[in-house]
Amino acid sequence: MIVKEIRDEDFTSYKKPSMVIGFPRCSWKCGKGLCQNSPLTTAPNIDISINSLIERYMNNPITNAVICAGLEPFDSWEDLQCFIMNFRYWSGDEIVLYTGYNKEEIKDKIEWLKFYEPIIIKYGRFIPNQQPHYDEVLGINLISDNQYAEVIS
């Protein structure tokens, strides 16, 4: 699997200590110049097996969730599916998906994800000059008013 980033421990993107996996593709629906993840476009690709990612997670006693984030995890749908299916074999911990898509744009994918609970999705494109707001589900501030998270399963 190709990823752009692996953070074994993150304490800022979710209310629980999390491993963050940065997926390598994006359709630039927000506009490349607006993307808060644009530095990842020039980051080198990391070629790592799904099993190695899961092993890193399982061997870390600090993390309690996995975050699949940007660039855009839904633009690497097959890899995301494979990761989730394999992760669920080993762990029932929460999987948080950070997406710039709106809920309506990924309805079919949400239906598939419901079988792999617990899954949380943070929806919404980045919009500049918005007031940050606290999201109860994630337990953090989100940067744009249109962004929100929900537990889908």
Q: What function would you assign to each model-found segment?
A:
Residues 24-26, 69-73, 100:
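Histidine- and/or cysteine-centered catalytic micro-motif in compact active-site loops
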Residues 62-87, 127, 131-139:
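Conserved glycine-rich "GG(E/T)P / GGGxP" loop and the immediately following alpha-helix
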Residues 25, 55-57:
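Short hydrophobic/aromatic-rich motifs at helix boundaries and adjacent loops
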Residues 22-25, 40-42, 85-88, 115-117, ...:
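Short, low-complexity, polar/charged sequence segments that are solvent-exposed and flexible
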Residues 11-48:
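Canonical Radical SAM [4Fe-4S] cluster-binding loop centered on the CxxxCxxC motif
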Residues 20-22, 67-69, 96:
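Short, conserved beta-strand segments within well-ordered enzyme catalytic domains
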Residues 41-55, 74-115:
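Canonical radical SAM enzyme core domain
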Residues 2-15, 58-62, 91-153:
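Auxiliary Fe-S-binding modules of radical SAM enzymes
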